[in-house]
């Protein structure tokens, strides 16, 4: 668990971890220079639970570096990642460990359902996402708080560390490149959403209506010129990252090919990228598009549409 000014909610999360039905070997908490009572609350818990190991950064590391360095401290064979403000189902770890071992996987993730006690809009989408490399190069669809992984995955992370990219995206890509990633299709995390959460973004309506489609396409095309450079920069980083893996599965080869094309904004590369996206249309979106014609059109436009991910 990594913390930063999490005093308001951390007790609920710690209680849900300590009371897991699966025995917890160690609880590593790394605080990123909190200015509230987070550290004091953790020290209270340490008095009655010696499995908790607290580390306080001398200087702020930021979310990604804080998580990566905290994960490197783990000494167990399996690691579960926790946010500071969620609430776990008490059988979360037991179920994930059982499924990961059964499937002989490097990483298992479960589903989570957002909740809030604040008056803020939520986007509740309980579809099982595409989580292959063809999707992960665009967006980290496997959130860290849902992951259980082999400790070995952390040692396999490429030396080309992407400081500006999400830690969970890097972990998911690495696990996919070296082995098997599986999803346990159960909702095991209550994922708290509040205005102070680092990852909270006000959701847009995703209802498939004519007005929403027009608004979505208009926004994507209008923002293309300002976002395409950021897409190219992002894909250059991803392409460099993927080249670090010695294995060359068909999924990795497709991800390498696509990230290479999308790192160049020339017209010919965009046409080639569109053709490849059409071929990979069942793998590149958040979830499989059931309407075949819509899938082809979305895929053909994907080199433009995906630029919205990288807007400021």
Regions found by a protein language model. Give the residues of each.
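Conserved donor NDP-sugar-binding/catalytic core segment of glycosyltransferases
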Residues: 91-122
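Conserved nucleotide-sugar donor-binding catalytic segment
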Residues: 72, 129-209
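Short, well-formed alpha-helical segments that are part of the catalytic scaffolds
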Residues: 6-19
